[in-house]
Amino acid sequence: MSSSLGKIALLIDGANLYSTSKALGFDIDYKRLLKEFQSRGSLLRAIYYTAVIEDQEYSSIRPLIDWLDYNGYTVVTKATKEFIDASGRRKVRGNMDIELAVDALELAEHVDQIVLFSGDGDFRSLVEALQRRGVRVTVVSTISIQPPLIADELRRQADVFTDLVELKSKVGRDPSERPPPRELRQHMPEFLQRDTSV
């Protein structure tokens, strides 16, 4: 089974995959995700795209980014842009679509299959361009909830659509299995660290 899909690249829209898995009630186990696709073919790249808020002292996504970076993924980040909307509310924007699209087109001549983890309809034209270059495209998102988290035009354009629910047993983890963040353990008040049972 090691070369059934040929040469593969995984392109993960981090924010989109996060919201999809949360809506379905499970976390993604990125170690298992990598192993699953390594077993399906020759995995050339696994790229995770996410925007980060740079001016925060602590970012909740930083431990994940660091782990991915050291465990077989290429991580592409971009600082978010902060602005005030028309009603005076602070908004944060960080879109990684262009970075993902450029990487996909550059990878096209080196892979047989691209697996895109996103439901964003903006990627329909990208999928079509990849197909014109002879690349098969699998899109992973979900139609298992209402409203579906994948744009209909993206699902129709893909060579294969895989509902994330179908991968849950292979790449999912129950949120209750999540270990406490190292930062919380390191910043625990001293009096909570001592054994007071004496």
Show which residues each predicted segment covers:
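Terminal and domain-boundary accessory regions
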Residues: 1-198
